[in-house]
Amino acid sequence: MLAVPSHYVKKVEAVCSTCPPPPPPPPTVGQFGGPLAGLSTSMTNLFNGGYGTFVIKWDPIRGLGPDSTQTGCFTCHGAGVDVLTGTAGDTSTTAGTRYGKWNSDNTFNYLDGTGTFPEDEGGPVMHGISNAAFGTLPGCSQVKVASNGATESGTTVTITTTTNHGFKKGQEVQVLGVGVSGYNGQFAIVSVPSNTTFTYTNTNSALASSGGGTAQNLPHEVVPADATVVSTVRSTQLFGLGLVDNIPDADILANAAASKQFGITGVANMIADENGVIRPGKFGQKLDAVSVFQFTANAEFNELGITTSNSLFGAAGEFNPTEHNPQGLAFPTACQPDTHAPQDVSQANMIKMTQFESLLAPIPPAPPTSQTTAGKTVFESTGCNICHIETYTTQQNVKLRTTSGGQTSVIPSLSNVTFSPYSDFLLHDMGSGDSGGIPFIPHGTGQASLTMWRSAPLWGLSNILAKEGGLMHDMTSTSIDAAIRRHGGEASQVVSNYKALSKTDSANLLAFLNSL
């Protein structure tokens, strides 16, 4: 049995003072959550080392951002309370919330301070535990201001809070939402007369008494009142990502260009990869990441508030260089425990995580039966296979990046491998049946659609169903039948074909899908 990598144990000790016990050994070939078959010893070691990095529980000292939704990759990609009860890379019932609003010119506002309408309200990701990990650190208390709790004498403002504030003289606080705007801002505390009052100096003298609001950043982000689009988005399982990463771009572009039946079209989401090269996206519900590295770095940044350097690859500047502030509000300077600027996660650890994810084996389908074989025929005749394309072959001579900036030797387990993810990796208009999402169009590119979604890869579908995870992007479809019927837009004719099936054909189709 493989031992936990020694560097992982040391890493855990460095990351936080209250970490759980070391996890079980990484799964081996053939085990659920194990690596691809046929890996060399050196590649297996990369998988095991990356596993140790993937399951780290982050805290503010090591770079967990103030705008975090969770404390580690495993929470969204592990299907368990922790690594002792789940499997790294697995599906999860954890979902994220995205928000934004339409502008008057029908462009979309991500409420993140960018674009034509630069309103920064912390969008488009709502960070459900923002600041929670910071509340026990000096300078990070979060308290409400009493309804009449802001008064002024000369230039000295006294703030009265509804609970013990825990602030100290000299520390910076953020006063937000107090009725008279002149009381709001970031200030150094001049005195602390009691545990529910503190004072600061304000250059705006003779302001009327006011109150309400907070002396804090919010304990967690909330959906802003002016947001007109709110979407729940499920976390994805990570099995087989390295195979998908190595689908030739030309194959995805060919899918987009192909003539299709039943009114189906589909578009590739052409975006810049981590090196600035425009390529079709392959990962994410909106196909907003080209590579495993980009997918991982974006998740680290958007879900954990962890910034990432891109200097190892020769690209200018940083990949995700600047932390977002909760609700778009400045974070108190006294509450910045991170000592790892400019990036929170080292390039080496980013590479280790992508190595682990790239070497994760896909979940194999169940052995075929006469019913599932018949169901596959129905799958094709109904038109499901137009968007859920079965097979691809990876490119030749695949290598992975190393922590030193070089490349591994060729990995046969990722090279010229035929596999079956069941997706065209295109975006399709799903109509009103699957609307409510944040648009896929990048900032500043004009019109956006809420109803465009990738064709979800169907491999591993049985695993999602076994863990009682709902289907579709928001997890609200509780069965395969419900998910199929919810398809609209481009898929309307295919849904009609499905509804017209005999009971036998329908049962066979569902059995086939349940076997994936």
Predicted features, each with a name:
Residues 4-142, 216-516:
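Periplasmic c-type cytochrome electron-transfer domains
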Residues 142-219:
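Small/polar beta-strand repeat architecture
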